[in-house]
Swiss-Prot record:
NCBIfam families: guanyl_kin (TIGR03263), PRK14738.1 (NF011325). It catalyses: GMP + ATP = GDP + ADP. This is Guanylate kinase. The keyword Metal-binding does not apply. It is found in: Cytoplasm. The gene is gmk.
Amino acid sequence: MMTNWNFNKTEKPLLLIVSGPSGVGKDAVLARMKERKLPLTYIVTTTTRPKRETETEGVDYNFIRPAEFQELISQNELLEWANVYGNFYGVPKAPIRQALSRGSDVIVKVDVQGAASIKKIVPNAVFIFLMPPDMDELTRRLEHRLTESPESLRRRLATAPLEIEKLPDFDYVVVNPEGEIDNAVREIMSIIAAEHCRIQPRLIEL
């Protein structure tokens, strides 16, 4: 029996991957987390798609030309990238490395396809699936966004059930009903707190 010990917990920074179907509220949840000034580093995804009027360069996405995106691929400077609905999206490696080296937890928002790609490369990341309470609510959210063409809306609604089938590949699920963003934020912060109490920390290597 141990009667005397000296235990100093050494916390390792986490790489958190937040994903889920289009319209589930990923942007809204992370925006609320940013409002609270939580000690996290948020990685901005790079994309070739056109910027929406409501979006800000360097905040919502880094918007670049297709030729620039191809250059990042050739330099192996993207953690993952994919062609989604005809546009390229990618997660830059450099800011992740920099944040982890400072000891900061890192949050990356990607679609379900991107999360699967990252899991093959960094299996020790923490994978969180943001879930709608039901398909009816997800449909209403997508329709109310007013940013989707009818064809894009049909594609996203057809893809959502297939994405939800990937739920078992994730570590945690957070249900995000309309109007309950604060609860979703609390659950994500509880996940982060629990992960920092692991006996065997997750070691992230990029």
